[in-house]
Amino acid sequence: MQLKSLTLTDFRSFEQATFEFQPGMNLLVGINGVGKSSVLDALRIALSRVLPNFTACQDKRLNFEVDDIMMGRDQLAIDLKFQAFDIPFICNVTRGKSHKVEFKPDSENILYPLKNADEQPLVVYFSTRRSVPIEKVINEKSSEGNQSAAFAEALTHRMLRLREFADWWLVQEALLDEEAKFAQQRLEVMANVVTRFLDWCTNLRAVAKPKTTLLLDKNGETIDVKQLSDGERGLLALVLDLARRLCQANPNLEDPLENGKAVVLIDEIDLHLHPQWQRTIVEQLTQTFPNCQFIATTHSPLIIGEVKPPGLTLITKENNGIVVLQKRLQGFGLTSNRILEQLMGTASRNATTQAQINLVEYALEEGELELARNRLEELITMMKGYDDEASRLEASINNLEALAEEVDLENEMDSEEE
C-alpha cells in the first residue's frame, strides 16, 4: 500500500493544503503548532473509515470531531489518493453535522477478494506515547491468529503494551508443535529485528511467571524491557509492533519484514533518540522494512539530513495564518548547522557567542587587528577552547598581520632607498 496524495480542506489550521508522498521516508518539518501532527491525524482517521472496505480490518472506525472543523466553516474535507493491491483508490471523507465517505472503486466484485487476500496491507500509527509502558488495558484481539489482529487499534494513540507482546510471543511458542516452520520464523523475525536496531540487546523472549512480560539480555545482563531507557523502549516499541503486525497480516510470507506492505505514521520520529541514533534511524527503517512507506514528523536536523529531497516537506504559516507548504527541499547531505539556518530558520549558535564572533569580524573589516585579536581571545575564553569558527578567525587575523608586516617591510625598504 502506498499513499499518493492528501488534500486537507478546512481541517483545523489548514484552509487548503495538498501533500504528496513518495515511497520510503517522508518527513513533515515545521515549528510547534504548525500542523505536523494534524496531518497524521487526518490520515489515520480518514483511513480508519475506509480500511474495512478493502482489507481484513475489523477495527472500530475513528471519528473527526466538530472541533476539527476550521473556525467559521461548516465542514471539513479529507481527500486521499492511494494504491493498494496494485489498484488506485480515491477516498473523500467529510465531516459537517455527520460523516460522509465516498470511496472508489466500490464494487464488491473488486473489494471482496481483497478482504480475503493472503497478504494484507497495513496502516500503523505511532504516537508520542509509544515508549510509555502500560499493563492494565489488554486487547485480546492482538494475540489472535487471524489477519484482522494485525489491524487491532493500529491507528490509536497506543502506549507500549508489553503484556500484549508477551502474550503473542507465548502463543507463537505454543504453536511450535502445530506449525513449527511459520511459528519459528515469526519468533526469529522478532528477535532479529531487535538486534538489528539495538545491537547490544539480544535473546528477546517472553516469560509467563512470575508475571507475563518480555525479557532480553542487554550487554550480557538479563533485564525486563521496562528497564530500558525511554529511547531504547520507544524504538523497541516501534519496530516490535510493526514487525508483529506484518507477521500477522502476512502469515504465509517467508520474510514479512522484507515483503510485507504498510503505511507507517510516526509522530516525532526523533523522540528520546540519541543524536547517533537520529542519524541512522531513517536508513535502518527503510532497509529493514523496504516495502513500507513512512510518513513522520520531526524537529531533528540530523534526521532531515538523511532524507532525499522528494521526501521532505516544510510546513510554515504566513502572518495571516495561511499554511504554506514548501516541497522537495534539499536537506540530504547538508550539515546540521546549514539545516538549522536554511530550512528551520534557527541560529546554529548560542546568541551571545554569535554576537562575540560578529565583534571579531567587525574589527577585522575595520582593519583593527589588535582589537580583533583581543576579541578573539575573549571568544576562546567564552567557549573554553577553539572550534572551527575560532580557528578560521585566528587564521584571518594571522594572515592580515603577516600581510601588514610585509607591507611595513616594503615601506621601510622604500624609505631606505630614498
Locate the predicted segments by residue.
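A general structural signal for short secondary-structure junctions and capping/turn motifs
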Residues: 68-72, 110-121, 228, 304
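Switch/communication elements of ASCE P-loop NTPase nucleotide-binding domains
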Residues: 1-54, 215-348
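Glycine-centered tight beta-turn/hairpin loop motif at sheet-sheet or coil-to-beta transitions
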Residues: 14, 83-86, 199, 220
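Short polybasic amphipathic segments
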Residues: 6, 73-84, 90-92, 101, ...
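Coupling/switch segment of ABC-type P-loop NTPase heads
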Residues: 96-195, 340, 355, 361
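Extended helical coiled-coil dimerization/tether regions that scaffold
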Residues: 149-259, 372
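Conserved P-loop NTP-binding catalytic core
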Residues: 29, 41-100, 104
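RecA-like P-loop NTPase motor core
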Residues: 113-115, 287, 302-418
